[in-house]
Amino acid sequence: MEDLMTSYSFTEKKRIRKDFGKQRSILEVPFLLAIQVDSYREFLQEDVEPNKRKDLGLHAALKSVFPISSYSGNAALEYVGYKLGEPVFDERECRQRGMSYGAPLRVTVRLVIYDRESSTKAIKYVKEQEVYLGEIPLMTENGTFIVNGTERVIVSQLHRSPGVFFDHDRGKTHSSGKLLYSARIIPYRGSWLDFEFDPKDALFTRIDRRRKLPVSILLRALGYNNEEMLAEFFEINTFHINPDEGVQLELVPERLRGETLNFDLADGDKVIVEAGKRITARHVKQLEAAGVAALAVPDDYLVGRILSHDVVDGSTGELLANANDEISEDQLAAFRKAGVDAVGTLWVNDLDRGPYLSNTLRIDPTKTQLEALVEIYRMMRPGEPPTKEAAQNLFHNLFFTFERYDLSTVGRMKFNRRVGRKEVLGESVLYDKKYFAERNDEESKRLVAEHADTSDILEVIKVLTEIRNGRGVVDDIDHLGNRRVRSVGEMAENVFRVGLVRVERAVKERLSMAESEGLTPQELINAKPVAAAIKEFFGSSQLSQFMDQNNPLSEVTHKRRVSALGPGGLTRERAGFEVRDVHPTHYGRVCTIETPEGPNIGLINSLAVFARTNQYGFLETPYRKVLDGKVSDDVEYLSAIEENEYVIAQANALTDAKNMLTEQFVPCRFQGESLLKPPAEVHFMDVSPMQTVSVAAALVPFLEHDDANRALMGANMQRQAVPTLRSQKPLVGTGIERAVARDSGVTVNARRGGVIEQIDAARIVVKVNEAEIGGGTDAGVDIYNLIKYTRSNQNTCINQRPLVNVGDVIARGDVLADGPSTDIGELALGQNMLIAFMPWNGYNFEDSILLSERVVEEDRYTTIHIEELTCVARDTKLGPEEISADIPNVSEQALNRLDESGVVYIGAEVRAGDIMVGKVTPKGESQLTPEEKLLRAIFGEKASDVKDSSLRVPPGMDGTVIDVQVFTRDGIEKDKRARQIEESEIKRVKKDFDDQFRILEAAIYARLRSQIVGKVANGGPNLKKGDNVTDAYLDGLKKSDWFQLRMKDDDAADAIERAQKQIQAHEKEFEARFADKRGKITQGDDLAPGVLKMVKVFLAVKRRIQPGDKMAGRHGNKGVVSNVVPVEDMPYMATGEPVDIVLNPLGVPSRMNIGQILEVHLGWAAKGLGRKIQRMLEAQTAVSELRKFLDDIYNHDSAINAERVDLSQFSDEELLNLGKNLIDGVPMATPVFDGASEAEIKRMLELAELPQSGQTQLYDGRTGEAFDRKTTVGYMHYLKLNHLVDDKMHARSTGPYSLVTQQPLGGKAQFGGQRFGEMEVWALEAYGAAYTLQEMLTVKSDDVQGRNQMYKNIVDGEHEMVAGMPESFNVLVKEIRSLAINMELEE
């Protein structure tokens, strides 16, 4: 391979992964959230000028509904343009306040009123106005929406593409097993039109899956008569009738093939086919060669054939026979008598020319177009009396109007391609030349003028009959060329259009009033329906989902998810096996591995790494072009339809130095099959080996060595990993980790290059490079505020930590700060643990995991979870609830964490049951006598009339209070705590703005200094004309006096003026921004109706790993921690180092996930190399030797590896820094399907001076004895999953009971009990433990008196129980009584 040197960014230089990939990357990993971000950007077209907007998204929806005309046609409302305002609250404020992040949509509309009197449409007056149409949610830059304070993701939908589809019933409908073919035209919106055969080979049609009608009724409604229908669908044989006897047939020899004649077929005297013999293709050739044009046939050859047209007596005009009649002998005689010289018959046979339409016409009861329209009306609206107009309108509105029917550009393209037309454009309604030519409205005339003589409906029926005749194939609906992706933008547009259509109805009514009453557009349009539709979609649609925010990977995969469920999609119950299965077209488009287990398997998929959607919404995947066996670097994206025509080689096909394919036969894919082809026949080649898998699957090293089912679990479980306290990069990765972390948006990346000026835990300030500074007021300072200890949707902790130091030189895109689960800009979901595969006293039976106490001590798997607890004070019927520290019947001790407002302090450590917010609720009481009222008024006795309803820490939770927020309704006085929080928030914002301004100001002055020092001045404070400006002079001046300098040089004078303007502009801007922020902080909050005050308390809970927690590797090897063993008892190596985790070796063979073994070996080598580097650094080896050793690690097999690491780019200091970062282990990348080979792993182990078998002798920690054979030991990246025993374990003594049965509720959330089910009852019965059983079924469950009595007895210290009647027995008695059977218990 040629040497490919990559230049490393500031972040990458800190730690470089050794890459084992053999294929050089042609394409970088694309921006992973593009499908979301691009789709919504197209929907909004925010940055496009109104007159240049494309016909997409909001613009298209508004254009399709407007103009709205009144019923009389004298007034119309036209659409001019729209603009989006600025959002009121930014993302952070929306999250905090529970608001939705969006911007107001203002649409400019024009009301036009026409003059009634004039004959032409003269305009009376025009009024243009901006109308507010509600809030449009905005997407954050990470592809999410903030709805009511929570982040949500709109999942893309994979639905059936509009167009026409041909299918058969697989022989299931009829008992004979005959294939019944059908066609279906699916529009984007509008009625479905189906065509289908019945077992007797007649053709039927259905509209919207209703009752079926003969297809000829539909054609007749379009205006075709019997003769025209037959002419469209059949070829015609012409017979000339001889006056006395016999018939002459105009011969087309091909049409005789397969027939058996009962007379000799001769050319003159020469007999070509004898009577009774079947005519073959050879005979046909002979006939053609002989040039026989006509054939004399006997009369009975014509009898029984089907007439293609009506036969009329020329002299009298009498109808002798109808089209579609079978000719009888009598009719033939009548034809002769009337002197008919020629008749046409349909050419049909049983083999490949079926008489389908002819059969259909025989069962068609209608004769005229009107009858057909009425028949369709009756089918669509049964029970309504049809009138001519109603029938015509209904039929026209079904398929031929733009308001009711829309194929869409995709549908039209698919339709035209399927019926074999070349052009992909056309009308979005079904077009029929004959039908539209007979109508005489403007729209129909325009359509007829623009289009050729085509008929969409006829062509579909023709293709269907061709397929029935055995020519043509049915479609595969699971082919990705027949399923398209609907992303956020498109779904939002549809919802918006639905809202607008509702508005349209209301506007139409009011427009008639507008003429007389002079209403303005604002008064005409009520925006509520639009706002409601959008709010409903983003808030509660099946595809608008609560974002999975466990870790960065789960965010990215959630946004890249593609679901077949949802409105207009499939349902779980109805989806069969075929839809869920992997299809050949999934290759490179949809991941073949990552899909949920369970009822949704195969219905929810993930986009492949390089997949993208094309303009029609079909998924495409990139390929490299191959010309005459030479592979080029040109990349072309192909959709599943286009790919069908090409032969495509694998990414790992062997090539030589000139990029020529070297093998004699190359393994390829063609039309879904795998085959071998010579290099000259190959058209394309895969871009990358990981093209077939999704992001999550591409993160699994050695995926190629894992069984697919386990790989699926591995990909899915990575999404459940909880971010640990200190992230640790995987020693063995795949090289895509950096891209995932970058695109997930959890890290802070530099917007522009520059130098780090100032840094603390919460903020990074960058002084931008001169070259990247824009003009105007841009002062060349970027300020990044970091997110500190915030709660995610899954209650995990989001926290960002700076990676850079003051003075570091960074470039655009460099990682400045790590987020959760990232380590120096790489995704790091778990920890690298030292693992041994061996049994250990049964503690790793059935996939259990044995942990060392060292893991707990070092907090390797300690995670922080942030819980949000809310206390709401409402206005009740009996008076308002109050939040205060004055709570009746509560000890002082219980209140010691509350301040005087009754809210817990920040920093308080609380346990289950502690009061966090004191709240009292007025309680209802009996009517007081006047005397009592008087006493109460005098002494103000309050304690008795309120009850304690404080917010307490829920059971099983303890933690530290890290934040408190108090929200107060507008117009209610804020309490002391709320004012304190408000003041501190204003202070913080003020400091933030002051700091920002100071930094900007300093940057502007520093730039100005560099521009004027050493220049000649014309004068200034204490400066004579002609003096030079010096640094010392400037230091002695007040900053604001610099602007009084008068420079000789024009450029310097301009610089001073520009600096002054910049500072003034920034000062103004900061003042305005601060005033705005201050206003938002001090204003009252918008709370739900009836809520006076709301307090949110955030608790940080620290969870250490403990028995019962679920852990997993990346290969689907999951298990539950069974025990945590003291370090001294763990097995240890000869060096004395104990292992961290002991796994069961029996978990490997039957699961067939060998990837974990390879990972362990390579991980051990990586760690060993790190140790070696550490020893070199400690011994202070010469830098040149370190450089040589690193070169040996990175480039030892540069002959086959694609990427070379060029260490000459590194200065000695950078190299030492790199070495320091590698002490923990040299990270390796083994890309999916292109990873490290066994030989390479051995080579690495050898470099690290470790045994090449990957096994070593372990010793028992408790006895010190050596185990009897060597053990596989090494490092594996192991994850802790978000299934923690703390969240699941739960105990109850007494608690809530179900209303009817009086049995305890179930589940942790309801504080329920454990169900003692029927199997448990059987166990007690088998033991004969009668009293225990009685206790279980009565006092511990639903014997109300018994359980109360039992509680009293326990309190009184009497340990006895009396079982009474279980409530469920009473329920049973009542149920039996409801069946009118009385049942009474007698003493």
From Swiss-Prot:
One of its GO terms (cellular component) is DNA-directed RNA polymerase complex. Its EC number is 2.7.7.6. GO terms for molecular function: DNA binding; DNA-directed RNA polymerase activity; ribonucleoside binding. PROSITE patterns: RNA_POL_BETA. The keyword Thylakoid does not apply. The keyword Transferase applies. Keywords: DNA-directed RNA polymerase, Nucleotidyltransferase, Transcription, Transferase. It catalyses: RNA(n) + a ribonucleoside 5'-triphosphate = RNA(n+1) + diphosphate. SUPFAM superfamilies: beta and beta-prime subunits of DNA dependent RNA-polymerase (SSF64484). It comes from the Bacteria. Disulfide bonds: none annotated. One of its GO terms (biological process) is DNA-templated transcription. InterPro entries: DNA-dir_RNA_pol_bsu_ext_1_sf, DNA-dir_RNA_pol_bsu_external_1, DNA-dir_RNA_pol_su2, DNA-dir_RNAP_su2_dom, DNA-dir_RNAP_su2_hyb_sf, RNA_pol_bsu_bac, RNA_pol_bsu_CS, RNA_pol_bsu_protrusion. It is an enzyme of class 2 (transferase). The RNAP catalytic core consists of 2 alpha, 1 beta, 1 beta' and 1 omega subunit. When a sigma factor is associated with the core the holoenzyme is formed, which can initiate transcription. HAMAP family: RNApol_bact_RpoB (MF_01321). Belongs to the RNA polymerase beta chain family. DNA-dependent RNA polymerase catalyzes the transcription of DNA into RNA using the four ribonucleoside triphosphates as substrates. NCBIfam families: PRK00405.1, rpoB. This is DNA-directed RNA polymerase subunit beta. It comes from Xanthomonas campestris pv. campestris (strain B100).
